[in-house]
Every structure is written in C-alpha cells, then in structure tokens.
C-alpha cells in the first residue's frame, strides 16, 4: 500500500441549504489512480473540487469537516489557494486552453511562479508535452494558437500545462467525456504512464475506463460514499448491493 497523501474527514458540503456531500471519509495514497463513479448529481465532481478548494469560487457554498494534505487542513486559515492549486492541479471535462500559443499555455504556471530563464522554459515545454503524449503532434506548432488544435490535442496540452508546475496530485473531472474514442484511448494510455510519478483522482461515467486504468474505485450515490476499495474488488465482487446495481446498469 502506498503512503497516504490526501484525505477527507467528515466532509460536508451545502449549496445553500441543500446538502450535496454527507460526511465523506476518504483517503488517497501516493502513486495511485482512483476512479470516482456514480450517477449524475451524486456528488463525485463536487467532492473532487473540494480537494483543491475549487468550490470556493461558487457562491453560497458551505463546507465543514477537513481535507488534510501534507499534514495540514487545506481549509485552515493559512492556506494560499493559488499555491495549493499548483500542488493539486485540475483537468476539466471540456478542454480549456487559454487563447495563447501552445508554448505560452504550457509555461503559464511557470511564469506565475516567476520563472524567466528561456532554457528552463523550453525544457519544461518539451518535457511536459512529451509526458502528455502530444509533443509529436505539436512540436512544429508551438507558437500557433492552442485553440487551432483538435479537441484531443487541446486536452493533452491542458494536461501538459498542469504537469509543467510539477504537482503532487492531478484531479481529472471526466477528462475524456468530450473526446472521440481514439483521443480517449491516447489519454488513458498517458494516464497509465503518469501514474508512475503522480497521484491521480478521476471522475468518470465510463465504467470500462474506470475498470481498465484505476487502482481504486469510489462509488458515490446521493452525496454519500457507498463503497471504496480496490477496483477489481469493486467491479467483480462489490460489498454493497447499490454498487452492484449501478455497475450492472440497473440504474444510473
């Protein structure tokens, strides 16, 4: 078992008076890819956004409980959210490159950190794009707009942008749902490679994707964590009937 890297304890989230997360206790280990599954509106994306305080940007949200990362509660008063999001990066459902060149997209976070050395920036661009399995596609287009790329290429550039600041954890909110099967397959293969270096937590509606590439799976339903275990156990021998019914397609 890997070393614990981030965990939530008794995490509740309310949109106004509506309780969207009902006391979630969950621990993630270093170097593992965890899939979070469940029907739409079950709380999995809401939970994911709690792990780097993205929900702070939503009006009328109340959060109680704790999320402990590197021994500190990220909801404590001394947390710098900008620094936190460099260490716990996020990739969204829709590719969201900035309206800049591919090169400027990748080094965006490094520029924020004050990095100016061209050699350092050049190396970071190549290393990150290679890690995101898109270097060969874009190496001759580095100074063209990232918006001119295909959807799959844009998503991989967004992943490279996260990798460039060398995070500990990468959060992925349905990163392949807007892409065609070929692009999705490329991203899945890339995630399997990245798992050797990063901890990843991924929301997905794709059951076969979760079973193929994740080490652990968490099943959410109506704001509750129903089951969390090794992926093989969740899919082949779930402990809870609700998990079995969801995986077998009886609801969702």
Swiss-Prot record:
Domain of life: Bacteria
Name assigned to this protein: Phosphate import ATP-binding protein PstB 1
Disulfide bonds: none
Gene designation per UniProt: pstB1
Subcellular location field: Cell membrane
Family in the record: Belongs to the ABC transporter superfamily. Phosphate importer (TC 3.A.1.7) family.
Gene3D superfamilies registered for this protein in UniProt: P-loop containing nucleotide triphosphate hydrolases (3.40.50.300)
Lineage: Bacteria, Bacillati, Bacillota, Bacilli, Lactobacillales
PROSITE patterns on file: ABC_TRANSPORTER_1 (PS00211), ABC_TRANSPORTER_2 (PS50893), PSTB (PS51238)
């Amino acid at each position: 078992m890997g070393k614990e890297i981030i965990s939530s304890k008794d995490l509740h989230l309310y949109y106004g008076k509506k309780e969207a997360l009902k006391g979630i206790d969950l621990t993630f280990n270093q170097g593992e890819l965890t899939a979070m599954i469940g029907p739409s509106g079950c709380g999995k994306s809401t939970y994911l956004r709690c792990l780097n305080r993205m929900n702070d940007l939503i009006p009328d949200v109340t959060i109680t409980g704790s999320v402990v990362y590197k021994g500190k509660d990220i909801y404590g008063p001394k947390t710098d959210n900008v620094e936190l999001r460099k260490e716990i990066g996020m990739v969204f459902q829709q590719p969201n490159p900035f309206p800049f060149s591919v090169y400027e997209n990748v080094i965006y976070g490094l520029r924020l950190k004050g990095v100016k050395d061209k050699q350092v920036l050049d190396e970071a661009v190549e290393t990150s794009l290679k890690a995101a399995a898109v270097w060969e596609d874009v190496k001759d287009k580095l100074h063209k707009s990232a918006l001119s790329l295909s959807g799959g290429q844009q998503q991989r550039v967004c992943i490279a942008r996260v990798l460039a600041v060398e995070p500990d954890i990468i959060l992925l909110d349905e990163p392949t749902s807007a892409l065609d099967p070929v692009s999705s397959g490329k991203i899945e293969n890339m995630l399997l490679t990245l798992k050797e270096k990063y901890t990843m937590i991924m929301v997905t509606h794709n059951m076969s994707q979760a079973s193929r590439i994740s080490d652990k799976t968490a099943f959410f339903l109506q704001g509750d964590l129903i089951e969390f275990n090794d992926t093989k156990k969740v899919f082949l021998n779930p402990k809870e009937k609700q998990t079995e019914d969801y995986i077998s397609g009886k609801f969702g």
